[in-house]
């Protein structure tokens, strides 16, 4: 089992960060290892959207597909994802964005375990690096979107 939690203050608003993480259809464009993503179902109830998504991940010769239930809560600025089917015993992630005067405080947590011991051992070797690369990719995507929108306003 592997888990990680981190908290960062970023110069982007909570709604800007939420928009980047909630835009799961774009993950193949910028999330390391995301080789494809397909929306299987989408439902909305007020400001809460629930998406069932199938993601293909690729790391070297390893390719796996898994299905998750993703909950987007716009009122609370929270994105939760829970594993439904695939190679994991469990996989849970949570992004929470708290407004701050000069941006937002971003809380990220991931907890997972593979069913297969070989996959578990391999993931343990690269887990910290992959988490850093993934969170860095979301921050870079926010910077890209924020800078583009800032220049368009000038």
Task: Spell out what each predicted region is.
Residues 20-23, 49-53, 75-80:
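Short Pro/Gly-enriched beta-strand edge/turn motifs at strand-loop
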Residues 1-48, 102, 154:
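Hydrophobic ligand-binding cavity/cleft-lining segments
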Residues 114-154:
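A conserved amphipathic terminal alpha-helix motif
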């Amino acid at each position: 089992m592997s888990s990680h939690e981190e908290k960062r203050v970023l110069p982007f608003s909570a709604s800007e960060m939420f928009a980047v993480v909630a835009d799961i259809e774009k993950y193949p464009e910028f999330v390391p290892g995301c080789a494809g993503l397909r929306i299987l179902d989408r439902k909305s109830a007020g400001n809460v959207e629930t998406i069932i998504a199938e993601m293909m991940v690729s790391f070297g010769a390893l390719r796996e597909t898994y299905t998750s239930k993703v909950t987007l809560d716009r009122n609370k600025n929270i994105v939760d994802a829970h594993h439904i089917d695939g190679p994991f015993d469990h996989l849970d992630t949570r992004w929470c964005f708290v407004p701050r005067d000069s941006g937002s405080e971003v809380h990220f947590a991931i907890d997972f375990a593979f069913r297969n011991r070989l996959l578990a051992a391999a993931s343990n070797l690269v887990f910290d690096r992959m988490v850093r690369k993934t969170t860095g990719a979301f921050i870079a995507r926010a910077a890209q979107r924020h800078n583009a929108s800032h220049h368009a306003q000038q």
